[in-house]
Amino acid sequence: SFSTASQIVSIRDKIECVNGLAGQFECNEIDLMSFMDKTEIGGSNSTSLNDIWGWTDPQTNKEYALVGMSNGTSFVDISNPENPIYLGRLPTQTNNSTWRDLKVYQNHVFIVSEASGHGMQVFDLTQLRNISSPTTFSNTAYYSGFGNAHNIFINEDTGFAYAVGTSTCGGGLHIVDISTPSIPSKSACVSDPNTGRNGTGYSHDVQCVVYNGPDSDYVGKEICFGSNETNVWIADLNTKSEDSSGAKTIGLGSYDNYYTHQGWLTEDHKYFIVNDELDENSNAYNNTRTLIWNVEDLSNPVIETTYLGPTPSIDHNNYIIGDKVYMSHYTSGLRVLDISNISSPTESAFFDVYPSNNNTSFDGTWSNYPYYPSGVIAVTGIDEGLFVVNPKGNVQGEAPTVTYEVPTEGSVTLAWELIGDSTTRMNIYRDIEEGFSPGSSNFLASVDYPGIEFTDSNLDSSIFYYYKLAIETNGQLGPYSTEIKVKPIVAPNQAPTIDVPADVE
């Protein structure tokens, strides 16, 4: 049972974390911006929340929470984190289910569930732009290549989705080509029968990246890091071909496992930080155990260190930005782990969404999404609702104002004003598609403070280029600039153009 739901009322307006409390919630260095009860976001008293992901509209810079629920997926505009707005929901494809998982690619969300026959729903998020009242939406596309699935991961750099825990592929990787989001198509099944409780290669969760770590044999290849119930599984998925023998396996990490649940890579691809969901519940460890794997040699992953948290709560999902790990620990809430000293990690902040207790039980928070440019974090409370929180010291910056000119044929010079220090830089993204989403695939360059301009050269003067810029401070990315459209051709008497935010007169 979930004892806190009836005790929490909806909250608008910021409640600061002062002396270890934000209202009734225990906290440290994280403020509460708002809370929406599950009945406000498309649920009933019997509905439960599960996974969460986010989307930032590349045209408007608005931020949205995509909230997994037992009865479907809800969409909430959190652009004003102190006054979130419920926009509507996409109902479950078949039946209700405790388990739902979702990720975003090219302005579409891809949704799977353990509901029987559910398949993968695809929804075009740009439909959220002009909603004036809560709406019940329909699929944009649908993939029926599997029924139920436990989780989904999307490699945005390659355009492949990885559904795991399905009734196909031994429960391993069911790979779907989503390079055209509205036309998903099966690519391959990959598993390793040396992993998983039933010897079929069942993967509970996975993260796949274009590898850029220290193991030179695999740089530039698509490498997957699976949490396969009994092992950490590392596999070369650069070639998408069928394999159920384990032939694609590079390395296996073995340890005193109870349930290898989920993990996330550090940004330098040197470490894989894993949660084991059942070790606390099995009374194997008194407090929450987080395993930090050294994966510098992909063929030989080894545990670098083990972190034991301050409570006995169960750990669930980890996500990483810079030297911080954002962890959902069921009854003890969102925990932030500082890994700047990887051999001796320390907790730097927390926000407990479940005030009743910190027991070893499956109550409290399921997951969190820390990747909004504004720096706010969306957190699900399983039986409570949606929390939006904000780490102290995170000041929601303004989008930069950028000027540009074409100094010579085939080149564009971008310029800006920047106030900062040695931790500040301007990140520049470029694409040839209008309305693009900034990310690693279209990242162009960074200019460290005090630099205030950048020239992009060797361009095709016959086409348009699109640019977005964002200020990064202490590893935290601020809002993106208005999209700049320019053709690098010199026009007679051409004057620089200034892009001014719409609210500036």
Residue ranges and their predicted role:
Residues 74, 424-427:
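Short beta-strand/loop motifs in extracellular/secreted proteins, especially
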Residues 2-396:
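Feature marking well-ordered beta-strand scaffolds used for ligand recognition
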Residues 427-460, 479-480:
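Recognizes extended acidic, P/S/T-rich segments that occur
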Residues 489-505:
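Extracellular interdomain linkers/hinges and stalk-like, low-complexity segments
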Residues 406-413, 448-453, 505:
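Ser/Thr- and Asn-enriched, surface-exposed coil loops between beta-strands
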Residues 394-423, 461, 476-493:
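Pro/Thr/Ser/Gly-rich low-complexity, intrinsically disordered linker/stalk tracts
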Residues 456-475:
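Beta-strand-rich modules
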